[in-house]
């Protein structure tokens, strides 16, 4: 593998044995691609905004004399960029402008004569835009739209598993689900009649819908039944014989062949042998006794040829009398329905008999009554209702997916078709459900991923937009019919409010529009790749059963079987597997390598769950020889959802990677294959809660996916194009682009601005730091700056800690964690949290609130940190209770006399009395002010601080743009100087030229002169561009802010809080091994090894065996080896000053070559001495290793690593007790584990209360930290005190410490006076009980004597 300059800084040793055929696809593509399809103009009009417009327009007036047509749309430019939207608290969106055409037709002239056409561009609201990282900024906060897994439209056949009827009989049903429109269900009842339901309403006999579709009884019978033909003879009947139909029947008569030989005697059962004999003798007719026909059903109406009277009606039971009537009328032939109990049931025949209707009109009326009970049906209304249910494109749409699923399920060859149902579709569904009831077909599995599809952002936004358009459509149609259209323009017809309201509602408050989880890069990526079965049109937690939540065989490579929440949402919220993607229909696909004749090719194909069932697929870890041929005879594979063994020649596909089945979060867990799935689930979930530490540290033991994740998440800055680093400071990186990557006529400079100390959604700190230096070459995709939780472009969620598995004085009982004081001293787990506190000044009825430093009844010291405008200065250290923004509110005064009121109205004098309503630091918070923002309403005078901030921003913008201009100008000038050099100017001449004269020189060569003129033009453009950009920036900064009604001013103060690690904080490894810190131990008391190095953390060994997460032990061993190798390299670097680099080079080469069949090849010999030295220096802290899931380091390789590091291969060391110096009685497992600090900090949870707020009804203290509440003393605690006999304690708990109002106020006074006595009274809850009993009509009074 070829490494770029920056990749050579630190190479992760990879233990992977399988070749990487396919890189992990871009992780956010599910979000970005979906939204791109929504906003991009689609000429076919099948998706996105275009489809929504085309489905609603043209809108015709009721009279048909005018219509509004859609022409095209365009999205404008957003007013503010993403960062500005976040600061100002507005939505990042672009205006949607639609070109509409209004056509007026001439009433008098022939139909279709156009009288007038008006075209106009109409504003139709703002559409929120997606940022480059797949999020939306809605009202200043970043949100993610989670994709939804819902049941695909189409037709599904199912049964009730025998749960409906007491007999346990299985009742089959069919359901046609459209993308939008009414659901149509068919179902059997226990008596085997077929019923239909529309939209889950009352059921009707299924033949009603057939009658409504204009089928007669005769046609219905012909559709669903075969016939049996009889010829009527004098005393007998002759039946046309189909031998197969006799199978399994008991003969009620002798069955003879054509010669009269008896084949089956009466009373015997007809077997397959008898049928073969009948077929052999070519018997086509069979004489049967007259009684044989009794109980059969006529296949058609039989009419007396003379009188026209119906002798036997279709579907009626035939008796001997009917037969006699037919004989008398001279009818010689008779057809009956072929019915048998086994596989040709009489279902439709039975249904027809309970069907109350006889013709189409009656059927339509019956359907109308069921859909609109209580309304009088008319013929037209009934017709229109039925037509609109399933056959109108406006009301019903199966969608492309639905039609494809429908046709495939019913074996209709074409995948395309109409979006509405046809007569044939409904008949085909009925035939299929009867087919299933007869035992010829299987029901569907609704949890199969072929029957569930993904609805992503774009599709949901399109649906929501269509909802808004439909609301507008009604209004437009009315306006087209009412007004004088000659005067009106399209703009006057359209009101954009309903559209923007629908879109806003979706992005702002839909269940699937979620506040982005921004703890760390992994949590961001996982949130964007989340697939939820909940939400509108999906399941609900309560109704979701066990089957829906369970792992299904089709999840393989599509949804992760490990990563899902614990708790009520388990299995309903899933994560996309690493390589999965959605196809054009919205079904999940996963890639496979093609296998031809037992040889694995590198050709990759994506298969959906439905396609996968047809093939035989082997796993990625099968043995292959050097030519890619499978070695073993029998190969473990999957076929039709089952695991089985097959010959190599039968294998058709193979997995692309062992990590294919798991999500990115699960594939970050090293040695995942050695962990129990429950613990792996916790490990995957807890990595998302890791807080970014002050200094990120890459994991020593990783899985090789860390870099991909960090780059794809968008928190690091990656180079867009190759070049050389030209300039680096803390907030900007400038890259001079390579000549071959330049676009014609550009300056060739890329500027990357870094994000500094901003707040994330979870109040953690987002900060980017450059990790490159001037002069370094970069290629596209190289990491230039690290973000939160990344280290040299690798994801780094925690810290590598030296760990020992041993008990230590009970401090690691029940998963507690003992840590060394050194960890806190070195700030290993120190995190920075940024809080945003807002102070809003409103206009009240009594006058305006004012932000000022002049606050009543507040001492000088409390105001010491405020400036003259009453706002805290940046850099101030504040603690709980300090004033951040001084604010006074007018206070309601005593009743004014009419004269005073008049004076107040005339002179507009403010209320004289004000109260302090300043913004203070919350209790238990202390930190440093890092930023202040002031937003002032348009038309309100800005205070001094706001003007200062504005000036600072303008100066900063000028400086930034100026530097950018300078850099770009220098780029143009350097190209011009090179041009002059090539044209014969000497270097001294060029150096002597002033900057402005470089571009105005005259060159003899015409081509070069033209080029120089182009550069001069470019320079002018740059200048103009700079002025324009600065003007826009200045206008944005100085314009007033659009604040909510009644708000005059908002001051936002940002407070940085530094949190060191302390007892009560939650920590975890990556294997689901979580615990709480119990004690921070002095370094000298910690166990230490023979070299005197103490361990950092002591974990309980009992936490491993029962939890079955052995991965952590292997990680500790491999971590020890990696660290040991780092120490050896450090020692060699000390020596290399005398010996040179040869020893280091050999050792590093040895390390990278270690392991059997390892795919990674690092050509250390090709490294220059400088590169090697830089690599070695970066490896001093330990060589990072990658052990991919299901393809990781084996025990033998870990032992080889330990040997290379000069450590015992058992992975255990002798340890000594830090307090006594005595050796522990047996060796202890010591090594390095990657530990995370989770966002469950004791500072956020710890809370205490003495007095505070009380509940209104019960007068008991509230609960929870947010309400400043207390702990509930519940009934179990009462029982405990009763059991102890602690009567007085109990009395005080239930009275003065809870809801005895008088008692507690008295007690407070007593304590203040130093009198420690109490008099308990009546608890309020007793009064509540009395009132509740009185509400039942029983009067209870307390007799106080």
From Swiss-Prot:
One Gene Ontology molecular-function label: DNA-directed RNA polymerase activity
Alphabetical keyword list: DNA-directed RNA polymerase, Nucleotidyltransferase, Transcription, Transferase
Keyword Transcription: yes
GO biological process: DNA-templated transcription
GO cellular component terms, semicolon-separated: DNA-directed RNA polymerase complex
Pfam families: RNA_pol_Rpb2_1, RNA_pol_Rpb2_2, RNA_pol_Rpb2_3, RNA_pol_Rpb2_45, RNA_pol_Rpb2_6, RNA_pol_Rpb2_7
Family statement drawn from the similarity comment of this UniProt entry: Belongs to the RNA polymerase beta chain family.
Protein name according to UniProt: DNA-directed RNA polymerase subunit beta
């Amino acid at each position: 593998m070829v490494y770029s300059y920056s990749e050579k800084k630190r190479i992760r040793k990879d233990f992977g044995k399988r070749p990487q055929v396919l890189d992990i696809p871009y992780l956010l593509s599910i979000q970005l691609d979906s939204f791109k399809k929504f906003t991009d103009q689609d000429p076919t009009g099948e998706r996105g905004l275009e489809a929504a417009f085309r489905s609603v327009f043209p809108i015709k007036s009721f009279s048909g004399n005018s219509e509004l047509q859609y022409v095209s749309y365009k999205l404008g430019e957003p007013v503010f960029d993403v960062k500005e939207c976040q600061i100002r608290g507005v939505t990042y969106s672009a205006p949607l402008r639609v070109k509409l055409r209004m056509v007026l037709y001439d009433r008098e002239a022939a139909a279709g004569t156009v009288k007038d056409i008006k075209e106009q561009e109409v504003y139709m609201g703002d559409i929120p835009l997606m940022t480059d990282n797949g999020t939306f900024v809605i009202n200043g906060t970043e949100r993610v739209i989670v994709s939804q897994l819902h049941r695909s439209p189409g037709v599904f056949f199912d049964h009730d598993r025998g749960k409906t009827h007491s007999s346990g009989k299985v009742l089959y049903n069919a359901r046609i689900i459209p993308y939008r429109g009414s659901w149509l269900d068919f179902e059997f009842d226990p008596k085997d009649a077929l019923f239909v339901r529309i939209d889950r309403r009352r059921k009707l006999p299924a033949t009603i819908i057939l009658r409504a579709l204009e089928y007669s009884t005769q046609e219905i019978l012909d559709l669903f039944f075969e016939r049996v033909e009889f010829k009527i003879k004098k005393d007998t009947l002759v039946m046309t014989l189909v031998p197969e139909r006799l199978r399994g029947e008991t003969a009620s008569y002798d069955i003879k062949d054509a010669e009269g030989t008896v084949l089956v005697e009466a009373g015997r059962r007809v077997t397959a042998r008898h049928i073969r004999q009948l077929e052999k003798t070519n018997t086509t007719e069979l004489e049967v006794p007259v009684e044989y026909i009794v109980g059969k059903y006529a296949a058609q109406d039989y009419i007396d040829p003379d009188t026209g009277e119906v002798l036997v009606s279709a579907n009626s039971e035939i008796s001997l009398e009917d037969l006699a009537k037919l004989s008398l009328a001279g009818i010689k032939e008779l057809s009956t329905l072929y019915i048998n109990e086994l596989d040709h049931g009489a279902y439709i025949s039975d249904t027809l008999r309970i069907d109350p209707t006889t013709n189409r009109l009656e059927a339509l009326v019956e359907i109308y009554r069921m859909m609109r009970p209580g309304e009088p049906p008319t013929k037209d209304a009934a017709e229109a209702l039925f037509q609109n249910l399933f056959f109108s494109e406006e009301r019903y749409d199966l969608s492309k997916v639905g039609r494809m699923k429908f046709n495939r399920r019913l074996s209709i060859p074409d995948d395309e078709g109409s979006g509405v149902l046809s007569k044939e579709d409904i008949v085909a569904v009925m035939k299929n459900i009867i087919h299933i009831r007869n035992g010829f077909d299987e029901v569907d599995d609704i949890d199969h991923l072929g029957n569930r599809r993904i609805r992503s952002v774009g599709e949901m936004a399109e649906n929501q937009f269509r909802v808004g358009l439909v609301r507008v459509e009604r209004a437009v149609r009315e306006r087209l019919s009412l007004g004088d259209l000659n005067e009106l323009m399209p703009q006057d017809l359209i009101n954009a409010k309903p559209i923007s309201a629908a879109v806003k509602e979706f992005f702002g408050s839909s269940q699937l529009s979620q506040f982005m989880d921004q703890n760390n890069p992994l949590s961001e990526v996982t949130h964007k790749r989340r697939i939820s079965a909940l939400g509108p049109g999906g399941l609900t937690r309560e109704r979701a059963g066990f089957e829906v939540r369970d792992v299904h065989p089709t999840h393989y490579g599509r949804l992760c079987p490990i990563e899902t929440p614990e708790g009520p949402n388990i299995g309903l919220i899933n994560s996309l597997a690493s390589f999965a993607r959605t196809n054009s229909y919205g079904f999940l696909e996963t890639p496979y390598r093609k296998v031809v004749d037992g040889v694995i090719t590198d050709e990759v194909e994506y298969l959906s769950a439905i396609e996968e069932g047809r093939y035989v697929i082997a796993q990625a870890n099968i043995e292959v020889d050097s030519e890619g041929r499978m070695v073993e005879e029998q190969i473990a594979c999957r076929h039709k959802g089952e695991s089985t063994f097959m010959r190599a020649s039968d294998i058709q596909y193979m997995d692309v990677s062992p990590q294919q089945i798991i999500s990115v979060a699960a594939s970050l867990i090293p040695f995942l294959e050695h962990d129990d799935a429950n613990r792996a689930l916790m490990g995957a979930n807890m990595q998302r809660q890791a807080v970014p530490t002050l200094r990120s540290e890459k994991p020593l033991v990783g899985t090789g996916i860390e870099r991909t994740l960090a780059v794809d998440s968008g928190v690091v800055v990656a180079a867009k194009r190759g070049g050389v680093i030209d300039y680096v400071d803390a907030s900007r990186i400038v890259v001079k682009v390579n000549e071959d990557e330049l676009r014609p006529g550009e300056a060739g400079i890329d500027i990357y601005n870094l994000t500094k100390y901003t707040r994330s959604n979870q109040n953690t700190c987002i900060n980017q730091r450059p990790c490159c230096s001037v002069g370094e070459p970069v290629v596209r995709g190289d990491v230039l700056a690290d973000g939160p939780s990344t280290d040299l472009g690798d994801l780094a969620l925690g810290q590598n800690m030296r760990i020992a598995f041993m008990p230590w004085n009970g401090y690691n009982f029940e998963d507690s964690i003992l840590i060394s004081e050194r960890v806190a001293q070195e700030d290993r787990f120190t995190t920075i949290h940024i809080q945003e506190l807002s102070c809003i000044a409103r206009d009240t009825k009594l006058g305006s609130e004012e932000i000022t430093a002049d606050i009543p009844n507040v001492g000088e010291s409390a105001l010491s940190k405020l400036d003259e405008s009453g706002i805290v200065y940046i850099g101030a250290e504040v603690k709980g209770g300090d004033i951040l923004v001084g604010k006074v509110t007018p206070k309601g005064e005593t009743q004014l006399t009419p004269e005073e009121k008049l004076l107040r109205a005339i002179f507009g004098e403010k209320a004289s009395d004000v109260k302090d309503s300043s913004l203070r630091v919350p209790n238990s918070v202390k930190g440093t002010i890092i930023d202040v923002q002031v937003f002032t309403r348009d038309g309100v005078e800005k205070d001094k601080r706001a003007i200062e901030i504005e000036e600072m921003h303008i100066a900063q913008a000028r400086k930034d743009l100026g530097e950018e201009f300078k850099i770009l100008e220098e780029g143009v000038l350097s190209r011009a100087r090179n041009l002059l050099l090539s044209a014969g100017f000497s270097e001294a001449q060029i150096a002597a030229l002033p900057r402005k004269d470089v571009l105005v020189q005259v060159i003899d060569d015409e081509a070069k002169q033209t080029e120089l003129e182009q550069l001069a033009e470019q320079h002018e453009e740059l200048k103009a561009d700079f002025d324009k950009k600065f003007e826009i920036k200045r206008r944005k900064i100085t314009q007033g802010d659009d604040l909510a009604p009644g708000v005059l001013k908002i001051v936002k103060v940002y407070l940085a809080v530094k949190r060191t690690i302390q007892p009560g904080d939650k920590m975890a490894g990556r294997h689901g091994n979580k615990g709480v810190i119990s004690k921070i131990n002095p370094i000298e008391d910690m166990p230490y090894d023979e070299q005197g190095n103490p361990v950092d953390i002591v974990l309980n060994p009992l936490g491993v065996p029962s939890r079955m997460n052995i991965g952590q032990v292997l990680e500790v061993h491999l971590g020890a080896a990696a660290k040991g190798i780092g120490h050896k390299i450090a020692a060699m670097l000390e020596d290399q000053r005398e010996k040179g680099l040869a020893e280091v080079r050999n050792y590093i080469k040895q390390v990278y070559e270690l392991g059997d069949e390892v795919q990674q090849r690092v050509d250390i010999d090709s490294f220059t001495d400088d590169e090697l030295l830089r690599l070695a220096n970066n490896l001093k802290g330990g060589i990072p290793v990658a052990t991919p899931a299901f393809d990781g380091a084996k025990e033998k390789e870990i032992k080889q690593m330990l040997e290379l590091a000069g450590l015992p291969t058992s992975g255990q060391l002798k340890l000594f007790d830090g307090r006594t110096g005595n050796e522990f009685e047996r060796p202890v497992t010591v090594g390095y584990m990657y530990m995370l600090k989770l966002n469950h900090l004791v500072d956020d949870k710890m809370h205490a209360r003495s007095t505070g707020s009380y509940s209104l009804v019960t007068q008991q203290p509230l609960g929870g930290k947010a309400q400043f509440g207390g702990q509930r003393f519940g009934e179990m605690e009462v029982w405990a005190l009763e059991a102890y006999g602690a009567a007085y304690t109990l009395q005080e708990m239930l009275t003065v410490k809870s809801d005895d109002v008088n008692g507690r106020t008295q007690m407070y006074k007593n304590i203040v006076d130093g009198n420690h006595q109490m008099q308990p009274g009546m608890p309020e809850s007793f009064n509540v009980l009395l009132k509740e009993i009185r509400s039942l009509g029983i009067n209870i009074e307390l007799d106080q004597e």
